[in-house]
């Protein structure tokens, strides 16, 4: 999306301090981490290909260990269409265990302010591979997100589902101007990612939250 000619300049990735855990370090060099004063020090990883590059023209917001501060930045961007007449598309990516469990009141306030954007609860679930063990094993963040009326929550299993949901969210929030924001949980587990089925109404069923993955009558499963 950042590389898209029409949308790219409006997309802002936000992380607290876990960009490498989520495999986002490639963005450091490509788009830079925003700093109002630029790079003032030599980072420890300066000799690596994907080093920690800060820039006055950086796009990514790397806020450090502060979920509240990161969510505040997301809210500012998610409401800029109203407060500054400038539509932005923020993606806040965080450990799902440290999302709604820590900033639920801010998420509720964002809903009241009619925020629009995407929250990505990464390394979610009880079986995903986390770097710090059980304290990161989230299995209940969707219960919390479901209490916010204008937060639409999804737990996709496959990449094509994620793509369909994000495309639908972009259309709903920014084209149709509906007042929702999206919470999506993703994992880092290794399993087969099948191609998108060529079945009728597949996109519609993904958005509804239920699709036919296999059929008992099929000779072979996907």
Walk through the language-model features, giving the residues of each.
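Single conserved hydrophobic/aromatic residue that forms the stacking wall/gate
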Residues: 213-222
